[in-house]
Amino acid sequence: MLYNLLLPHIHNSHIANLFHYITFRSGLAIIITLSLSFITGPILIEFLRSIQKNGQPIRSDGPESHQTKVGTPTMGGIMIILSSCLSTLLLADLTNKYIWITLFGFISFGIIGFMDDYAKVTKNNHYGVRGKSKLLLQGIISVIICVLLEYLDKSPSHLLNVPFFKNLSLDLGYCYIVFAIFVIVGSSNAVNLTDGLDGLATVPIAFTAGSFALISYLVGNLIYSNYLQLTYIPNTGELTVLCAGLVGSCLGFLWFNAQPAEVFMGDTGSLSLGGVLGIISVITKHEIVLAIVGGLFVIETASVILQVYYFKATKGKRIFKMAPLHHHFEKHGWAESKVVIRFWIISVIFALIGLSSLKLR
């Protein structure tokens, strides 16, 4: 909004001219979301605590140390969604179609997560909304997003770019739409599975959002995209502002979510954040890079899939002591803080590998 209001005065005012630069608005987005989180965090946490008598239900079959988390409120993802959306509406170009499509998906996935968290809190169990119902709703939202992208793009690309290889891309035709839906839904649920310890998912999400802030900026810049031999996609640069807002809001949330957590982001946060990262990867045509940068999410998801299929195939045997993988290490005796920090280190490594694909090809 500020960008659109100041746009006519860019050449007449030095301050207005600053808003012409995506980098300036992105930095400002981080500052705004951090500030909003610090200011509204205590108020929101106290409100959630007052309306949630027992907080987020804790699994009885989980690590014993988790019983100390009883009474911790959930739905903290509301803080992330509100601060990110507000900074985006203030600083991004509101005539940009990608901004509105991404915000639509972000909020929609947040609503699905809120419904799940609400069901858990009111029923006082950790099951919430049925898995198939959530998948159906996620699928519907993803279909709408993909149809919008297909309809609004004058010449939509169905190419899947392969990182680390020069000029290597796969033409999926209209099957690309199915693939894009899979990416968005898969990303949403992968982040959700990772969010099982205090602060565990928050930092990797921030790393991934930061990586895609850079990717969005490069892909939306004709000079940089040509130099790096990336597919140039006009107007994606504005997503840098949104991604920067995600980074700031996640760091602000971490202030309250660090062990021992004062609040959990819940499915409200994890489903929305995973979904928005998937949407941005589809828009920027860096779906495979998302799987690399967010490699920790992939590993956590794979551990659950392997555990379920192995359990069924062997009629009761398990590969891991508990899935997702972070619980396996807890069952092995690792302290929660050690699991979290080591997984953060892994996510940094994956982010660096993913970003290196922009140049190494």
Swiss-Prot record:
Protein's UniProt name: Phospho-N-acetylmuramoyl-pentapeptide-transferase
Keyword check for Membrane: yes
Superkingdom as given in the UniProt entry: Bacteria
One GO CC term, this protein: plasma membrane
Function as written in the Swiss-Prot or TrEMBL entry: Catalyzes the initial step of the lipid cycle reactions in the biosynthesis of the cell wall peptidoglycan: transfers peptidoglycan precursor phospho-MurNAc-pentapeptide from UDP-MurNAc-pentapeptide onto the lipid carrier undecaprenyl phosphate, yielding undecaprenyl-pyrophosphoryl-MurNAc-pentapeptide, known as lipid I.
GO molecular function: metal ion binding; phospho-N-acetylmuramoyl-pentapeptide-transferase activity; UDP-N-acetylmuramoyl-L-alanyl-D-glutamyl-meso-2,6-diaminopimelyl-D-alanyl-D-alanine:undecaprenyl-phosphate transferase activity
PROSITE patterns to which the protein is assigned, alphabetical: MRAY_1, MRAY_2
Keyword Magnesium: yes
